[in-house]
């Protein structure tokens, strides 16, 4: 006979009645000494933690990464140390601008945040389903996100704000072109590629550094939603992508992605006219071809959405020995911002939660703080240096090689590199006629309510990318090209 599980309070006290509040008589007022009622309501009031400022609506799954190629030439990281080696992973997909209850089928980049639970700690590659981003200096990130959120007065989203910002930030053109193409609304999360987007680094056992860009190629192929179908699903099944991912894994249809990288030497980076750390631009795959590294599959759904998907706290600052960052400005800003956002959203000790805790364990001198539940370092000293032989000690063998720098500290104008148009134009010219028509139609539909001043300014950018691109948008909006040129 199965033993009965007794309902208790949070303090473990058995609950005799979970159907009726305690009252003064059958029709009298409730009593404050009904601690079960008070505790239940108080906890309910605090069930919701602050949602992410961006990437609030998300879906996730666990899986396994397997190395398929020898990586010793590039990295000393242990997760790469042998072919066929496997490492647990956690991948969180998301939309970017929408709130936690928004539709999965909005036109928006998709977050592609991948965690490797390695034997040397957690390694997080917090990317998107696009290889570039809208801006390249984190100083403008709050401004950009404000344009994607709701207006202060009306609490409505504003195409005027979006296009006003984009038209005054022409480095956004490449990402805008991707966003309004057929790939702007993926058919769920399984049928899209992922990217690290930024430039990262790998460091080998000899201390040699290579710059890399990460690419995740969907084994399921690419599928996108037509805008009309996306709109229909937003009303009939707003959790469409979440449902598709969860149910596919439950059926045993495990999605897979091939992990590839582009590699650039430090010498090549130093001699390039175009900044290789500019996240608004891609590297040529002809010059820097994709190199396969491995493959991962997602094969297990979370047991509890809040505990795992909502409380997971990914951060680009999580890197392991043999893996590093780069001078990419946006990456540098995110290294601080993401971990700081997690401390605000989840709490000071967010790394101790099961979904965030490294499998390798941790040893440091961090103590106390709200919701500390790991023993708090016990009786060990909470300072360093100290005389205790068993206390954690620094390990100089993990030091990264020096990074050569040049120039004085200053606020350098990143717009001295003003080629915002060639890669967006190249992308437009790669599209077939149907894809070009869809791109232009999507932009025209999105800009219809925008002021003529902003329309003219943005069309000028499209024209510089490709004359047919600008002319198509101008015709759709009824703008005389003579006003633009």
Label for each model-derived stretch:
Residues 1-485:
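Active-site-adjacent core segments of small-molecule enzymes
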């Amino acid at each position: 006979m199965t033993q009965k599980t007794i309902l208790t309070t949070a303090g473990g006290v058995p609950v005799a009645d979970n159907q009726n509040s305690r009252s003064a008589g059958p029709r009298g007022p409730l009593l404050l000494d009904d601690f079960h009622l008070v505790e239940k309501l108080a906890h309910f009031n605090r069930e919701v933690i602050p949602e992410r400022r961006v990437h609030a609506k998300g879906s996730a799954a666990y899986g396994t990464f397997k190395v398929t190629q020898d990586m010793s030439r590039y990295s000393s990281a242990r997760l790469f140390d042998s072919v066929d080696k496997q490492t647990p992973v956690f991948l969180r997909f998301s939309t970017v601008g929408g709130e936690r209850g928004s539709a999965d089928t909005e036109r928006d980049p998709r977050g592609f945040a991948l965690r490797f639970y390695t034997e040397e700690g957690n390694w997080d590659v917090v990317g998107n389903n696009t290889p570039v981003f809208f801006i390249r200096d984190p100083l403008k990130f709050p401004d950009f996100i404000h344009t994607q959120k709701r207006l202060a007065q009306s609490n409505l989203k504003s195409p005027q704000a979006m296009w006003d910002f984009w038209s005054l930030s022409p480095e956004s053109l490449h990402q805008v072109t991707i966003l309004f193409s057929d790939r702007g609304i993926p058919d769920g999360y399984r049928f899209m590629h992922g990217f690290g987007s930024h430039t990262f680094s790998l460091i080998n056992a000899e201390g040699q550094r290579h710059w890399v860009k990460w690419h995740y190629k969907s084994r399921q192929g690419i599928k996108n939603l037509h805008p009309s179908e996306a709109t229909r699903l937003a009303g009939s099944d707003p959790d469409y992508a979440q449902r598709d991912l969860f149910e596919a894994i439950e059926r045993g249809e495990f999605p897979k992605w091939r992990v590839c990288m582009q590699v650039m030497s430090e010498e090549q980076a130093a001699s390039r006219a175009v900044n290789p750390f500019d996240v608004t631009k891609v590297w040529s795959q002809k010059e820097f071809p994709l190199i396969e590294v491995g493959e991962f599959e997602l094969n297990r759904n979370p047991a509890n959405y809040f505990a795992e998907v909502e409380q997971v706290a990914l951060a680009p600052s999580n890197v392991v020995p043999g893996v590093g960052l780069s001078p990419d400005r946006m990456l540098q800003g995110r290294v601080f911002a993401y971990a700081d956002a997690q401390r605000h959203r989840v709490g000071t000790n967010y790394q101790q939660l099961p979904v965030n805790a490294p499998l390798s364990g941790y040893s440091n001198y961090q103590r106390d703080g709200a919701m500390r539940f790991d023993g708090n370092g016990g009786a060990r000293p909470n300072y360093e240096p100290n005389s205790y032989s068993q206390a954690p000690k620094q390990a100089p063998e993990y030091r990264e090689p020096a990074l050569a720098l040049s120039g004085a500290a200053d606020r350098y104008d990143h717009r001295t590199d003003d080629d915002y148009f060639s890669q967006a134009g190249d992308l437009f010219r790669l599209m077939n006629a149907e894809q070009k028509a869809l791109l232009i139609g999507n932009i025209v539909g999105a800009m219809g309510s925008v002021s003529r001043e902003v329309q003219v300014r943005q069309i000028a950018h499209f024209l510089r990318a490709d004359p047919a691109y600008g002319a198509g948008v101008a015709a759709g909006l009824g703008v005389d090209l003579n006003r633009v040129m």
